[in-house]
Amino acid sequence: MMNFWSALYRRKRSVRLQLLVMALVPLMVLLPVLLVMGISRWNNDYNNLLIAKVESELQVAEQYLQRIVGATGTSVEALAASLAIQKAAEDGRLNDFLTAEKDALGLDFLSIVQPKSIDEHMQKWPVVQSALTGTARTAVDLFEADDLLMIDVALAEQAELILIPTEAAVPSDKVAETRGMMIHTAAPVSINGSQRVLMGGILLNRNLDFIDTINTLVYQRKNTAEDPRGTATLFLEDVRISTNVRLFENVRALGTRVSAEVRSAVLDQGQTWLDRAFVVNDWYISGYLPIYDSFDQRIGMLYVGFLEEPFRLVKRDAIAMMWIAFIGVLIVFIPVFLRLAGGIFSPLERMTKTMRRVETGDLTARNNLNRTGGEIAEVSHHLDT
């Protein structure tokens, strides 16, 4: 037994083993470690690049929303100060004039009201309060169904959405969303010497032109069922009220809801979400930001995002190619290293065998190595002589 362990110990300490370890450890251990570290760093950089991409796209969407809000306010304020509205009032065609201007400005409603006819319910809006004190103001606010009915029955009908059960959303017993998200503006206007308020607005529920324009600005192409990679959505709280995310074919995911994780971060905590997120039925690299009303309350979210799958496949293929290249290096260079190592330990093993023969009494034993074999061959020659 002792002879066995002694032999094993000597074998472990043999030159052959040491040389093999020296030759193969860098290839079999160090290189894989370096490769894993490199892949991990590359993977993080790649993910950061995707996040930076969606962040810039979210900024474009936010700027467009702000531009619409600003343009709506500027247009209504300019109209209130124009001579055209005064002339229309003098000619008794104010209603026709407002209807034409509403269509020209792309508004969903435009009307003039007297301060005394504005009930307490309408006066709750800071936008209206500001106009009553002589200053125009524009904001995004939530209108209850009754508010919309007072303006136009068609707006109440446009706003209503049946809620669709959505995977990963916060559980809710609510079956429909009847409120409307409105960009509304109010400006003071003088009609025949009487101070009044010019009010106008754009309903964002089912406003597909608005959301498709955002998608075109961000992704430079129109989203279709066949190419749904770039998406944009407007949320009223956590409900999709305008979106080009598809449920299937050309059916938009109106009435579906955001995931509980995103709702908590954006609506509850006021954070901007820049990460992967589950959107209706797939994973997207997503950007969400909160939308605030005139009371500085979070009332919804603006979202842009693109499918993760194409980028995940590119990343998977790239990592696979790195490992294939590494394995190819091993296949090519391990035989080379073994051959180089063999050029060292083979002469040494031959010398060891020769010395053992001499120890057993065979004085004719010789190494007979070629002297051109380097330093080891020189040592072998001296031993032979």
Functional labels for PLM-detected ranges:
Residues 31, 35-92, 104, 280:
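Membrane-proximal amphipathic alpha-helices
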Residues 18, 22, 39, 43, ...:
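Cytoplasmic juxtamembrane amphipathic helix immediately C-terminal to a transmembrane segment
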Residues 93-100, 104-175, 207-221, 242-277:
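Extracytoplasmic/periplasmic sensor domains and loops in membrane signaling proteins
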Residues 110-116, 224-227, 231-239:
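Short hydrophobic alpha-helical segments used for membrane anchoring or interfacial signaling
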Residues 343-385:
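HAMP signal relay modules and closely related sensory coiled-coil linkers
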Residues 3-4, 13-44, 323-327, 331:
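Extreme N-terminal signal-anchor transmembrane helix of membrane signaling/transducer proteins, especially
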